[in-house]
Amino acid sequence: MKSLVLIGFCLFVLFGFQRKSARMPWRDGHSLRWSDFQGLPSKGSVFSASSNTGISHRFTIKSTGIIDKSKSIIKANFYPKLSWYKPELIDEFTLKHEQTHFDISEVHARMFRKAVAEFRFTRNSKAEIQRIYKKIESSRRKMQNQFDAETEHSVNREAERLWEAKVQALLHKYQPWAG
């Protein structure tokens, strides 16, 4: 009986106190809210907010050494604990700007899914998938930086609107590869 209680307590501690997921996957129709930003602002940062987004991927390799495409999982994620804002410096445009960063990551997750679907993998699948990922990730980072530069981190409202439209068009273009 004591063993059963001890096992029950250990399971409660192990699973009962687990925090919310460390990442939040991109979902169509779901927009970020300020409550999703749970991190603390970087000391000395001149920015009003920062969203930490990226792409995660998981693959299964068959006994032949080739990736099983049907079991591949590619997601764009938002990382709440690494994302933050300064309440006194934000407005509705700031949140839209941060959402566009998340949407850019989703565009690249779709591009990654498309590349995987079209690629003919060999027994060298692990290296091949890493090459594809590195190329997509480089493109994602470049686009994120270009977005911030051209919109002046959400200050240039006209550039912001153009970028929002551009990213929405890309989401539509890559819709067949939505998660």
What are these regions (language model features)?
Residues E118:
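Substrate-binding clefts and substrate-entry loops adjacent to catalytic sites
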Residues M111:
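Active-site catalytic microenvironments for nucleophilic, acid-base chemistry
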